[in-house]
C-alpha cells in the first residue's frame, strides 16, 4: 500500500536473482518468502531485503531520516553504501540519518506507524515544520506560519484524513 505523494518503481516482470523495486515516499509491503528471489526495496541511501514479512518503509526525499519498521517476520536493512546491515525483529524500527549516516533502533508504537493506512495522521513530539510537510503531502494546500517562537516547540496530535463511518451516515 502506497502513502500519499509516494512513487514505487518496478519492472513489468521480475527477472534475475532478485525482485527489486525503488521507493520514493512511504509504503507498506506484505511479501511472501522466496529465498531464490529475495524482495528488495531500494530507497535513497539504503535498501530493505524482505525475508518473508510485513514491513513499512518511510523514505520521502525531503525528510532527513529514513525509517524501516518491521511489523512481522524479518528484514535486513543495508545502508552506508551497503557496507553495514541490521536484521530487524518484529516491532523494531531502524532510523537512518541521511546527513550524518548514523542509525539507531527504536521500538515505535506500531499503530502510529501504520496510522496512514487507516486514514489517520499521528504526530508525536514533532516540529511544526515537519507536521506541515506531512500535511502538504496529504492535502493540496501550503501551510505558512509567521511566529518564529512556534518553530522551537514540538507538538502532538491525531488527525483523521478520511471521514469516519459515523460521519458518512
Q: Model-found features: residue ranges?
A:
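A residue-level detector for the "anchor" residue at the start of short, highly conserved motifs
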Residues: 1-162, 166
Amino acid at each position: 500500500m502506497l502513502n500519499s505523494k509516494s512513487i514505487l518503481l518496478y519492472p513489468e516482470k521480475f527477472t534475475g536473482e532478485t525482485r527489486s523495486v525503488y521507493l520514493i515516499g512511504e509504503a507498506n509491503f506484505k511479501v511472501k518468502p522466496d529465498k531464490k528471489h529475495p524482495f528488495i526495496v531500494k530507497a535513497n541511501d539504503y535498501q530493505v531485503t524482505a525475508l518473508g514479512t510485513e514491513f513499512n518503509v518511510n523514505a520521502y526525499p525531503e525528510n532527513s531520516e529514513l525509517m524501516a519498521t518491521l511489523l512481522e517476520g524479518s528484514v535486513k536493512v543495508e545502508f552506508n553504501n551497503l557496507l553495514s546491515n541490521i536484521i530487524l525483529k518484529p516491532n523494531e524500527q531502524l532510523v537512518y540519518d541521511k546527513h550524518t549516516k548514523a542509525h539507531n533502533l527504536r521500538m515505535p508504537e506500531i499503530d502510529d506507524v501504520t496510522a496512514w493506512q487507516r486514514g489517520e495522521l499521528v504526530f508525536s513530539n514533532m516540529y511544526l515544520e515537519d507536521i506541515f510537510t506531512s500535511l502538504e503531502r496529504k492535502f493540496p494546500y501550503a501551510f505558512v506560519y509567521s511566529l518564529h517562537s512556534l518553530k522551537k516547540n514540538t507538538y502532538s496530535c491525531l488527525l483523521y484524513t478520511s471521514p469516519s463511518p459515523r460521519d458518512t451516515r
